């Protein structure tokens, strides 16, 4: 058998990639139908790092709340889609899924918006 060569990467250490995602809950929090602190607690309990929920990888993932915006910062690969999944799960648990939806308003942020119900269509049906 031929000896196995080890690949040596020149250039030293890899640059740490810090991922930062924000969840804007301004509208539902102002209207009083949702509690941002409760949502932050839900994320801390549910986010999985290395297959384990609740510990946030010993500081690898951090969750910060400022008024009605929640910021999730991660030093390990973390999916924005996973954050959307957890947000939808929270909305379903609190029976808010029928009124709120999760919309991406930029590359690294989500916003909770109300469903737009067309008032014109309802008025036309009432007239008939």
Swiss-Prot record:
Molecular function per GO: heparin binding; identical protein binding; RNA binding; structural constituent of ribosome
Domain of life: Eukaryota
A GO BP annotation: alpha-beta T cell differentiation
Main location: cytoplasm
Phosphoserine modified-residue sites: 66
Assigned GO CC terms: cytoplasm; cytosol; cytosolic large ribosomal subunit; cytosolic ribosome; extracellular exosome; focal adhesion; glutamatergic synapse; nucleus
Chain positions found as N6-succinyllysine: 69
Record carries keyword Ribosomal protein: yes
Modified residues (Phosphothreonine): 62
Location in the cell: Cytoplasm
Pfam families: Ribosomal_L22e
Misc. comment: Binds to Epstein-Barr virus small RNAs and to heparin.
Summary of the function given for this chain in its UniProt record: Component of the large ribosomal subunit. The ribosome is a large ribonucleoprotein complex responsible for the synthesis of proteins in the cell.
Family: Belongs to the eukaryotic ribosomal protein eL22 family.
Subunit comment: Component of the large ribosomal subunit.
Protein name: Large ribosomal subunit protein eL22
Organism in which the protein naturally occurs: Homo sapiens (Human)
Gene: RPL22
């Amino acid at each position: 058998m031929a000896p196995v060569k080890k690949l040596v990467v020149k250039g030293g250490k890899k640059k740490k990639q810090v991922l930062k995602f924000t969840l804007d809950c301004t509208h539902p929090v102002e209207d009083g139908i949702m509690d941002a602190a409760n949502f932050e607690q839900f994320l801390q309990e549910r986010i999985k790092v290395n297959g384990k929920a609740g510990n946030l990888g010993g500081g690898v993932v951090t969750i910060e709340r400022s008024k009605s915006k929640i910021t999730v910062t991660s030093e390990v690969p973390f999916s924005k889609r996973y954050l959307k999944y957890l947000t939808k799960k929270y909305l379903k648990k609190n029976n808010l899924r029928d009124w709120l939806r999760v919309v991406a308003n930029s590359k690294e942020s989500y916003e909770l918006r109300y469903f737009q119900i067309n008032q014109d269509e309802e008025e036309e049906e009432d007239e008939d």
